[in-house]
A protein has these predicted regions:
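N-terminal substrate-binding region of glycoside hydrolase catalytic domains
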Residues: 14, 18-39, 57-65
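Short hydrophobic interaction/assembly module
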Residues: 45-73
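Active-site acidic/histidine proton-transfer and metal-coordination neighborhood
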Residues: 66-168, 178
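A generic structural signal for well-ordered alpha-helical segments
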Residues: 45-49, 87, 129, 222
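Active-site beta-loop-alpha junctions enriched in small/polar residues
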Residues: 6-10, 26-30, 56-61, 100-102, ...
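Glycine-rich, proline-tolerant flexible connector loops at the mouths of alpha/beta enzymes
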Residues: 26-48, 99-109
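Short, conserved clusters of charged catalytic residues that mark active-site
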Residues: 39-40, 120, 180-184
Length: 258
């Protein structure tokens, strides 16, 4: 099990000094799928990181739609191929498909058609992932951020429908708790879980800072399932210099005591 933070690589040296294992960057900063190869600078940025960049989130910009009438298969295919090839070249193992602005179902649009569009997109993710040796993970988002794929259980419907080793499931503690989802769904999804995001429910602060969130029930399920993948802190207003060490200690202690 490796612990990282969703942040810029500019914080990597500080993270390394505190004992973190990796950086989770933003796809729009590091993979830049909208740019041509001669414009891409993410490889140069990654080479300056004091820690490996093992994962990336925010797969899609809001301008690229996965659902609705503005779905453009050709543009998405070009974008995904760039992302896959670039992720492989800099050693990124996991790319997160959250992208609420891209997959949000437009008002009045047929929901079953939107679900079919997402299934097609997930198939495309699996193909690109397989070709480049990376794993895409489907992230559930709370309803305030997106109106589709709001739970682990719902994310799993797309993972199971795709049925491919390059497409797996992410568990996000903040979104899980926000939706009051039973942790038993995590146990059911355990064989397909390949990435984890952490934040307290109260204020979406980094683990332990609110003093009110207990990760042990979820960590217990992960440990029972022999989870040995990446776990990233994805929190609001996380002052890494001030709080990074105690957050890391808190997560490690909760894991050990689960």
């Amino acid at each position: 099990m490796k612990l990282g933070i969703c942040t810029s690589i500019e914080n990597s040296a500080l993270m390394k000094s505190q004992g973190w294992d990796f950086v989770e960057e933003n796809c729009q900063n590091i993979l830049q799928g909208l740019l041509n190869d001669d414009e891409w600078t993410g490889d140069e940025r990654a080479s300056r990181s004091a820690l490996p960049v093992r994962s990336a989130n925010v797969l899609l910009p809001g301008s690229l739609k996965v659902t609705g009438p503005d779905f453009e298969e050709t543009a998405l295919a070009t974008y995904l191929n760039r992302v896959g090839e670039r992720a492989k070249s800099i050693g990124i193992q996991t790319v997160v498909f959250g992208s609420g602005g891209s997959r949000n179902v437009p008002d009045g649009f047929d929901r079953s058609l939107a679900q079919s569009q997402i299934k097609d997109f997930c198939t495309a993710l699996a193909i690109v992932g397989s070709a480049n040796g990376i794993t895409f993970v489907v992230e559930h988002l709370r309803r305030q951020e997106c109106n589709i794929i709001n739970t682990v259980g719902e994310a799993m419907t797309y993972v199971l429908a795709t049925n491919h080793a390059a497409l797996r499931c992410l568990v996000d503690t903040y979104d899980l708790w926000s939706e009051n989802e039973d942790v038993r769904t995590v146990r059911d999804a355990m064989p397909w879980i390949r990435h984890v995001h952490l934040a307290d429910l109260e204020g979406r602060v980094a683990p332990g800072l609110s003093g009110k969130s207990d990760y042990r029930p979820i960590f217990s399920i992960l440990r029972e399932g022999n989870y040995d993948g990446l776990i990233s802190v994805e929190a609001s207003q996380f002052d890494i210099e001030k709080d990074g060490e105690r957050v890391l200690d808190f997560v490690r202690t909760q894991w050990q005591n689960a």
